[in-house]
């Protein structure tokens, strides 16, 4: 096995011996078969990367929002001021009370673990349609298990997807409309314990 080369041979860099495009040359085609501007492609990549980071921040905050050091106004770094959320547990509009809305759901469990994947981002100027898969594991609180008529077991899991729209703001990309769609569950959820 060859060690990793910091500078691959020219044949690898330029596609196996084909001539590498000149700097500034238009090299890719858009969906309609026309040529795309390299700067637009770069801007699109940067926007997609920023939105992917937004998704990652949100996914991490779902699990860490109640940990010491997390700013109580964390939703401002994720959502627009007029955001609209539609979840199986309820709906919320605007930033006011949004942290408490998320926290109330999380406090039903002693811990949560969210995993996201397959981030589909479709740019439309200063807006973007987003969809990604989510698997969330929720660890029931010991007192919840003791109080239940029938022990729900240690875990409640949910698989589904988030879908919504993001908007470019003065502070960067933020979710403007956001919803979660359940595809499957495993275990007993809080609604079945109340």
Regions found by a protein language model. Give the residues of each.
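A beta-strand edge to alpha-helix "cap/lid" segment located at domain peripheries
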Residues: 2-13, 17, 22-39, 107-118, ...
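A solvent-exposed, acidic/Ser-Thr-rich amphipathic alpha-helical stretch
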Residues: 64, 71-136
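Glycine-rich, flexible loop segments associated with nucleotide phosphate handling
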Residues: 62-65, 69-79, 149-159
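Alpha-helical interaction segments
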Residues: 47-49, 91, 152, 163
């Amino acid at each position: 096995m060859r060690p990793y080369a910091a500078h691959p041979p020219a044949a690898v860099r330029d596609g196996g011996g084909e001539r590498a495009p000149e700097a500034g040359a238009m090299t890719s085609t858009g969906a309609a078969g026309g040529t795309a501007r390299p700067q637009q492609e770069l801007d699109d990549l940067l926007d997609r990367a920023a939105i992917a980071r937004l998704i990652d921040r949100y996914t991490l905050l779902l699990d860490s929002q109640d940990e010491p050091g997390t700013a109580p106004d964390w939703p401002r770094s994720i959502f627009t001021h007029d955001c609209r959320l539609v979840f199986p547990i309820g709906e919320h509009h605007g930033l006011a009370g949004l942290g408490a809305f998320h926290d109330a759901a999380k406090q039903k469990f002693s811990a949560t673990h969210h995993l996201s994947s397959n981030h589909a981002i479709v740019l439309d100027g200063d807006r973007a349609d987003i969809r990604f898969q989510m698997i969330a594991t929720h660890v029931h609180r010991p007192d919840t298990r003791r109080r239940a008529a029938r022990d729900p077991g240690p875990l409640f899991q949910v698989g589904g997807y988030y879908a919504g729209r993001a908007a470019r703001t003065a502070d960067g990309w933020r979710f403007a409309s956001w919803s979660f769609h359940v595809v499957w569950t495993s275990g007993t959820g809080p609604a079945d314990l109340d």
